[in-house]
Amino acid sequence: MENALRQLGDEKCAELRVDLVRPSMDEMKGLLAKKDVSYIVTCRPGVFDEETSLGYLTAAARLGADYIDIEIERGTEVAARMKAACDGTKCKLIVSYHNFDCTPSRDELRSIIAECRGRGADIVKIACKVNAPADNAALLSLYGDGDGIVAFGMGEIGKISRLASLGCGARFTYVASDNGEGTAPGQLTVSQMRRCIEGLAS
C-alpha cells in the first residue's frame, strides 16, 4: 500500500487495483478520502474469492470512488449488484472487455459494447491486443458509437491508440507510473504520455 501511494505522487486520477495492492478496508477508506484524486477501483479475479472481491467494490462505491470496474465475464447478476451499489452515490460503473490475443472485428466489438451497456455500464472499456495497424483503426472507430467509451489497443503496435483515444473522446486512458511496472502490455509511462500530449499541443 505504501508503495502504491509513492507511485501515485501528485496525480489527479488513478486506478486502484485491489487485487494487486490488497489494502485493508481502513486503508482503502483513507485513500478514497483524498478528494483531490479521482479513483477507478477494480479487483480482477484470481486473488480474492468472489464475495470478498465484490465486497471491496461495493465499499469503494460507497466510500467515494468515482468509478468501479468489473469484467463483462462476471455476468449479469454481478453487474446488477454493482450497479445497485452505485445507486445514490457519485460512483459510475465501468464494464470492461479485455482480449489479450487479438482485436475482434468491428461488428463483434459493437456487439460487446451493446452487451456492456445492457448490463448498466456508464462507461464501456475495450482493451484488445493489436496485431496489425488495422486493429488500431477498428478500436478507434468505436468512438463514433456514442459517449461513454474508452477503447484502445494493447501491445507495442497498440501504443499509439492509447494516445489517439484521448483525441477521439475517451474520458481517460491508462498509463504506468514512472517508478513502477505497468499493468498491461504497451502502457506508456506518465512522463511519456505527458511528453506526447505536450508535443501535440505545442
Task: Label every model-predicted segment.
Residues 1, 101-103, 132-134, 157-160, ...:
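A short acidic, often aromatic-flanked loop/helix-cap motif at beta-alpha or helix-coil junctions
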Residues 1-54, 62:
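Conserved N-terminal beta1-alpha1 strand-loop-helix module at the mouth
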Residues 2-5, 28, 57, 79, ...:
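Generic hydrophobic/aromatic pocket-lining and core-packing "Φ" positions
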Residues 10-12, 36-37, 59-67, 86-94, ...:
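Glycine-enriched alpha-helix->loop->beta-strand junction motifs that scaffold or abut catalytic
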Residues 13-23, 42-49, 57, 65-76, ...:
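Catalytic beta/alpha-barrel core
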Residues 143-202:
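C-terminal alpha-helical cap/extension of soluble enzyme domains
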